[in-house]
Swiss-Prot record:
One of its GO terms (molecular function) is acyltransferase activity. Keywords: Acyltransferase, Cytoplasm, PHB biosynthesis, Transferase. Belongs to the PHA/PHB synthase family. Type I PhaC subfamily. This is Poly(3-hydroxyalkanoate) polymerase subunit PhaC. The gene is phaC. It comes from Azorhizobium caulinodans (strain ATCC 43989 / DSM 5975 / JCM 20966 / LMG 6465 / NBRC 14845 / NCIMB 13405 / ORS 571). Its EC number is 2.3.1.-. It is an enzyme of class 2 (transferase). Polymerizes D(-)-3-hydroxybutyryl-CoA to create PHB which consists of thousands of hydroxybutyrate molecules linked end to end. PHB serves as an intracellular energy reserve material when cells grow under conditions of nutrient limitation. Residues 560-583 are annotated as: Disordered. Gene3D superfamilies: alpha/beta hydrolase. Residues 300-508 form the AB hydrolase-1 domain. It catalyses: (3R)-3-hydroxybutanoyl-CoA + [(3R)-hydroxybutanoate](n) = [(3R)-hydroxybutanoate](n+1) + CoA. Pathway: Biopolymer metabolism; poly-(R)-3-hydroxybutanoate biosynthesis.
Amino acid sequence: MEAFAQNLAKMVEEGGKAVAAYMRPREEGKPDDMTDDIADALKTIGEVANYWMSDPKRSFEAQSRLMMGYMGVWAGALQKLSGEKAEPIAKADPKDGRFKDPEWESPFFDALKQTYLVTSNWAESMVKEAEGLDPHTKHKAEFLVRQLSNAVAPSNFLMTNPELIRETLSSSGENLVRGMKNLAEDLVEGKGDLKIRQTDMSAFEVGRNLALSPGKVIFETELMQLIQYAPSTPSVKKTPVLIVPPWINKFYILDLTPEKSLIKWMVDQGLTVFVISWVNPDARLADKGFDDYMRDGIFAALDAVEKATGEHQAHTIGYCVGGTLLAVTLAYMAATGDDRVASSTFLTTQIDFTHAGDLKVFVDEAQLSVIERRMKEMGYLEGRKMADAFNMLRSNDLIWPYVVNNYLKGKQPFPFDLLFWNADSTRMPAANHSYYLRNCYLQNNIAKGLAEIAGVKIDMGKVTIPVYSLATREDHIAPPNSAYIGAGLLGGPVRFVLAGSGHIAGVVNPPVKHKYQYWTGGPTGGDYDVWLKGAQEHKGSWWPDWAQWFSALHPDEVPAREPGGSAFNPIEDAPGRYVREKS
């Protein structure tokens, strides 16, 4: 008990440091961003509650349903206590790692678990069955209830998690001292906001053990650096490849390690690969919009690619929002008679945002006005804001396990390159991000043919070059039906391919791993589910399928090219300095 008392005192001391770290920026006048978010959430949940509470009969029915569930849990607990076998009223998903500890099957903790599951299932059903809500409000309410349900799980609290109780008793509370220390450090790192560590950030460094493919930065603007990768084959395909990654994350997800690198694999296939590395913008770039990213990003890169290789045309690859910008750029080029792009590959790219997934819950006029107000004050959207939004999409994987591990078990997270990249967030210029949210998520103007860029109306039907469009089956950011509908807007031949897994793992899937699968089928157009029903499944990675499609376009080869050619003196080694800039 003496050791426990000493550790309790240490925990209180570390807790004081955590409170001080949280309060410091607020005492200095930093606005609390949570106020607007909480008000919006309460308004949304209030609309659901109003439906059930406005009619006494409905209200009684809802309460009775919940009470019946609790009575079933109570009856089952009594059966267990008397030594009888009881069938659970509510079962956790077999894949749910929160309740894997055997102690969750004991009468007390099983009743606690089932009470939680009954309550969360009931709350979700209240939203699902509420009538008279517009689709966006219902979608947002479902998302918010899911977030709340995930947050209040008994596995997230010391006194209701049997594993944490054992850990605390066996270590005399040392886990809580370490956990409070971790909490204070993360609040300091987040400058008063909680920046949950998902991995050991000291284990990785871009350019040291990540983003290692050899190459040179041959050209740069204030928005991007252009990297040309060194060849690994004596000859290469005549027409070069330009990759346009997202600026919401950093490009090295495509070059994490040599074993996982799509960039290295393409180079080894005999391609001359160029990649745009976007700048991590600050307030000086606040007014840079979508058209600037087109001109000083893609167009400037195409000019440099032509000078470096002598080739007028290039094949392009766009990933996520980089693909959306590329699609808009291709429509602009089609309208202005610019033929510098020979083909395009879209990786988990949305052009039509009708079914854009859970990210849509963050975008309506009220929320967007708040975001734009914050961006106007700073000149950009903080990288942490987007990182938090992405983590909330999978909070049971990317938030709460780390809360338990870091702050209640007092452990350090394991080194994991993917999660290092996930935490290496970037800022977004105010003008660019506002255009993207309004024209894509809020108004869907690109798909409707109402969007303009640099004074030109965008018509995706004018894009007639060959296209390879990849979606991933479990994508929560760019859902496959959304990518499918967008691909159907294009005016040329489209090979639509569906890969297994999600937004990252489905794309970065080296063939040597023999993981997942992909599906191929007929042309786009019509219903996605009909396409999927008729699609053929193939084992393994989609990369070889893409290589076969790509090779048929321009099979001619030339001697391998060194980065920059005779036109450019390399500025620095890949991956360059832009990608190293922290948010």
